[in-house]
Amino acid sequence: MEEPPVREEEEEEGEEDEERDEVGPEGALGKSPFQLTAEDVYDISYLLGRELMALGSDPRVTQLQFKVVRVLEMLEALVNEGSLALEELKMERDHLRKEVEGLRRQSPPASGEVNLGPNKMVVDLTDPNRPRFTLQELRDVLQERNKLKSQLLVVQEELQCYKSGLIPPREGPGGRREKDAVVTSAKNAGRNKEEKTIIKKLFFFRSGKQT
């Protein structure tokens, strides 16, 4: 049962070796630093050694050769460490995938939550930010608030009209205006109508609805 994967890995390694042979050692220099392997480091070492040998046997070339070898050893160590870290991450990823699959198989009650329906929800009673009112209750509260706000605006406009003198102040029960109320009822009715019209105009002007 395990032979096919081994054969596939061998085939992949064979393909990589063929590609490396076709490209040659120079192909290692064109790779990204994150894609380098130990074989690529060996190819780079071969290229640099060949170039140094072409320079001759000058003592300075020999000293430079030792430095280049040291740098290549450091590069090889970094590449090997990166490869090991990558393999560890892949193994951890596969392990986590298996754990997630196992948890999904062991937790079928999650399907029960879907059966609540589109118009239902689960509320945590210990959550201080949980919803405490229904949507209809909030709508009623907002409607009542807007109604009271409009009434307050009317009262404020009427008070402003009294203060500015647009509406004359009313006298008390013992005043002359109340004594002559029967005689001047028609005038008062017309005046009250005019006062309401002024208040209405002022209110609509404040609301941006002047007629």
UniProtKB/Swiss-Prot annotation:
GO-annotated biological processes? cilium assembly; epithelial cell morphogenesis; protein transport from ciliary membrane to plasma membrane
Q: What is its main location?
A: cytoplasm
* Outcome (variant: R132E): Loss of interaction with RAB8A, RAB10 and RAB12
Q: In which tissues is it expressed?
A: Widely expressed. Expressed at higher level in lung.
Per the UniProt entry, the effect of R130E is:
Loss of interaction with RAB8A, RAB10 and RAB12
Q: What residue stretches are annotated with the RH2 domain?
A: 130-201
The cellular component terms of Gene Ontology attached to this UniProt record, alphabetical and capped at eight, are: centrosome; ciliary basal body; cilium; cytoplasm; cytosol; intracellular membrane-bounded organelle; membrane
One annotated GO molecular function is: protein dimerization activity
- Sorted UniProt keywords: Cell projection, Cilium, Coiled coil, Cytoplasm, Cytoskeleton, Phosphoprotein, Protein transport, Transport
Domain RH1, first and last residues per copy: 24-106
Record's InterPro entries?
DZIP_RILPL, RH1, RH2, RILP_dimer
UniProt lists compositionally biased (Acidic residues) regions at: 8-21
Q: Where is this region: Disordered?
A: 1-32, 166-190
Task: Tell me what happens on changing K149E.
Answer: Loss of interaction with RAB8A, RAB10 and RAB12
Q: Where in the cell is it found?
A: Cytoplasm, Cytosol; Cytoplasm, Cytoskeleton, Microtubule organizing center, Centrosome; Cell projection, Cilium
Q: How does it assemble?
A: Homodimer. Interacts with RAC1. Interacts (via N-terminus) with MYO5A, the interaction is required for its role in dendrite formation. Interacts with RAB8A; interaction is dependent on the phosphorylation of RAB8A on 'Thr-72'. Interacts with RAB10 and RAB12; interaction is dependent on the phosphorylation of 'Thr-73' on RAB10 and 'Ser-105' on RAB12.
Tell me which family the UniProt entry assigns to this protein: Belongs to the RILPL family.
Outline what the protein does.
Involved in cell shape and neuronal morphogenesis, positively regulating the establishment and maintenance of dendritic spines. Plays a role in cellular protein transport, including protein transport away from primary cilia. May function via activation of RAC1 and PAK1.
Task: Identify this protein by name.
Answer: RILP-like protein 2
